[in-house]
Amino acid sequence: MAERSAPIGVMDSGVGGLSVLAEIQRLLPNETLLYVGDCGHIPYGEKSPDYIRERCRRIAGFFHEQGAKAMVLACNTATVAAVADLRELYPTWPLVGMEPAVKPAAAATRSGVVGVLATTGTLQSAKFAALLDRFANDVQVITQPCPGLVELIEAGDLVSPAVRQLLQGYVQPLLAAGCDTLILGCTHYPFLRPLLAGMVPDDVAIIDTGAAVARQLQRLLGANDLLAEGPAGAARFWTSADPEALRKILPVLWHKSDDVQSFAL
């Protein structure tokens, strides 16, 4: 059985999972966190499920070698493609994935119209269709794929005219259709929440699942007697792209400067 002091592995296709990592560290400050951003293979949203599964297997294997006690797939697209596969490979491992917040959005909407901003891979998945079938029968859900946003966020671009224009083009049709609740269905998108909030009326709710994932991780660790005790844990970072690129963006998205190592698998 893993030690309580063992680390937790958190992965994303790039830097979007840092939004989830922040929620985990906020809720579980004693945990040691290992973060792999698969930036050399981004964007996952345009890749095949088989390709994504293979990348997730490699990263999960790395976490296992590092002695991780649990893993978080901090990526909606990776969860869709690989979570079932990884649960078969590591049946005793607490493993938490992401999914768009359809259930809370359907409960929150007053107009009966919910908008979803996500990658093509997430929106076209059977898992997303099942979420709609289970939780959104009584509301209208309008989906909006958002090509280009992930790449801008990966570059640390959160406020430029280019990102503003692109986001506006994706959001305006949803507002015109009567959406009063917007789901951020990609872990990159919470970094654009301040920009998005300035584009929508005050009564439009913006929902993502980072905090809910942190709570689920806390529940699973507690149920397996794996919650860390003692001093505050640290975070360590790896990337499959140029480490210097992630080093430069960490102060923007993580609000701290940390060393970044190369992940060559």
Curated annotation (Swiss-Prot):
The keyword Cell wall biogenesis/degradation applies. The keyword Cell wall biogenesis/degradation applies. It is an enzyme of class 5 (isomerase). GO terms for molecular function: glutamate racemase activity. It catalyses: L-glutamate = D-glutamate. GO terms for biological process: cell wall organization; peptidoglycan biosynthetic process; regulation of cell shape. InterPro entries: Asp/Glu/hydantoin_racemase (IPR015942), Asp/Glu_race (IPR001920), Asp/Glu_racemase_AS_1 (IPR018187), Asp/Glu_racemase_AS_2 (IPR033134), Glu_race (IPR004391). SUPFAM superfamilies: Aspartate/glutamate racemase. Pathway: Cell wall biogenesis; peptidoglycan biosynthesis. It holds the Pfam family Asp_Glu_race. Keywords: Cell shape, Cell wall biogenesis/degradation, Isomerase, Peptidoglycan synthesis. The active site is at C75 (proton donor/acceptor), C186 (proton donor/acceptor). Substrate binds at D12, S13, Y44, G45, N76, T77, T187, H188. Its EC number is 5.1.1.3. Provides the (R)-glutamate required for cell wall biosynthesis. Belongs to the aspartate/glutamate racemases family. This is Glutamate racemase. The lineage of its organism: Bacteria, Pseudomonadati, Pseudomonadota, Gammaproteobacteria, Pseudomonadales.
